[in-house]
């Protein structure tokens, strides 16, 4: 069988570029979930050491922040290790205002909690309403308090020493 030298040269040229095993393909970049899964497995191992128990039938969780906003977990997983005073909440939090959650929270609370919550809400509303009104007035008073009164014949050097 005769071998065509042109075809042979062409094939050799192609094989020089492609090396043995075919064309080289770039690998897809791994996403950040691999490290997140690694962190989760470490966390699960630590919780296993603490003998944490999974709490079932927890539908939602709310964490109240100092600034009046609430971290709301709609679908939440909870693990508790009471002997170590440790609770773990899994889920995606949504930051909401207290007024948004009032209708859904009130049926779940007892009478004492409702009273405390209404007092907290009124305090927050009063603080928010009073803050813009007093900002300008307090700034003016502060400037007046920082400036000492000048009295003829007295110097302030004696007070410093």
From Swiss-Prot:
It is found in: Cytoplasm; Nucleus. Residues 135-146 have a biased composition (Basic and acidic residues). Keywords: Cytoplasm, Nucleus, Protein transport, Repressor, Transcription, Transcription regulation, Transport. Residues 14-41, 125-161 are annotated as: Disordered. GO terms for cellular component: CCR4-NOT core complex; cytosol; nascent polypeptide-associated complex; nucleus. SMART domains: NAC. GO terms for biological process: cotranslational protein targeting to membrane; protein transport. InterPro entries: BTF3, NAC_A/B_dom_sf, Nas_poly-pep-assoc_cplx_dom. Residues 37-102 form the NAC-A/B domain. Residues 125-134 have a biased composition (Low complexity). One of its GO terms (molecular function) is unfolded protein binding. Pfam families: NAC (PF01849). The keyword Transport applies. It comes from the Eukaryota. The keyword Transcription regulation applies. Part of the nascent polypeptide-associated complex (NAC), consisting of EGD2 and EGD1. NAC associates with ribosomes via EGD1. Component of the nascent polypeptide-associated complex (NAC), a dynamic component of the ribosomal exit tunnel, protecting the emerging polypeptides from interaction with other cytoplasmic proteins to ensure appropriate nascent protein targeting. The NAC complex also promotes mitochondrial protein import by enhancing productive ribosome interactions with the outer mitochondrial membrane and blocks the inappropriate interaction of ribosomes translating non-secretory nascent polypeptides with translocation sites in the membrane of the endoplasmic reticulum. Belongs to the NAC-beta family. This is Nascent polypeptide-associated complex subunit beta. It comes from Eremothecium gossypii (strain ATCC 10895 / CBS 109.51 / FGSC 9923 / NRRL Y-1056).
């Amino acid at each position: 069988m005769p071998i065509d030298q042109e075809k042979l040269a062409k094939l050799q040229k192609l094989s020089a570029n492609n090396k043995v095993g075919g064309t080289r393909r770039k690998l897809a970049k791994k996403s950040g979930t691999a490290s997140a899964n690694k962190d989760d497995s470490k966390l699960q191992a630590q919780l296993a050491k603490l003998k944490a128990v999974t709490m079932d039938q927890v539908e939602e969780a709310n964490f109240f922040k100092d600034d009046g906003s609430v971290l709301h977990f709609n679908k939440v997983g909870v693990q508790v290790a009471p002997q170590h005073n440790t609770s773990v909440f899994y889920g995606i939090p949504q930051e909401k205002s207290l007024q948004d959650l009032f209708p859904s929270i009130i049926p779940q609370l007892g009478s004492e909690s409702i009273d405390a919550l209404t007092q907290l809400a009124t305090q927050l509303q009063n603080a928010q309403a009073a803050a813009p009104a007093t900002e300008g007035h307090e700034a003016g008073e502060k400037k007046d308090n920082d400036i000492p009164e000048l009295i003829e014949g007295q110097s302030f050097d004696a007070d410093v020493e």
